[in-house]
Amino acid sequence: MEFKKFLSFAIFIIIIISSNNSVYSIEPDIFVQSTVNRASQALDDKFSKKEKIDKLKSIAKETVDIQGISFYTLGSYRKNLSDEQKKEYTKLFEQYFLKSFSSRLAEYSNPHIEVQSKKKLNENYTMVSSVLVETEMRPEVKIDWRIYTKNIE
């Protein structure tokens, strides 16, 4: 049940595809499938738990807009904070996010996530729908990814 709640949180994850990065030219659904494939490889049984956690943290740092999520969680309180407070909050949030994200997923074995569809919401946002395929040990879980495509020129 905890893992299902965690995956529900994934709906709010904003992933940035930046032109400074080779993934800019990749379609959002292909980017998501590539990212989940990398995560699945990181969860291979040949790696120790620490190695899995390190690999998952690296993937998250590359693909998740952790600062954007931290500001989103602050909501309207953000405007009342100084730049130094925002910087400290973002640093602590990143530590918490990476620890929570990686340690929960590191316990998961053989995840198989399939991208099912994508829907362009506007010029910058695309919603990619996927599913964690059910097994004898777990039910099917739907995961929606909100992808923000950022063109830095």
Functional labels for PLM-detected ranges:
Residues 1-10:
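Bacterial N-terminal signal peptides that target proteins for export
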Residues 16, 57, 106, 119-121, ...:
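Sterically constrained small-residue positions within well-ordered secondary structures
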Residues 27-105:
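Early exported N-terminus immediately downstream of N-terminal targeting peptides
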Residues 19-25:
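Sec/Tat signal peptide C-region and signal peptidase I cleavage site
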Residues 9-18:
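Bacterial N-terminal signal peptides
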Residues 39, 118-153:
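Exposed beta-sheet edge and beta->alpha loop/turn motif
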Residues 105-117:
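A short, amphipathic edge element
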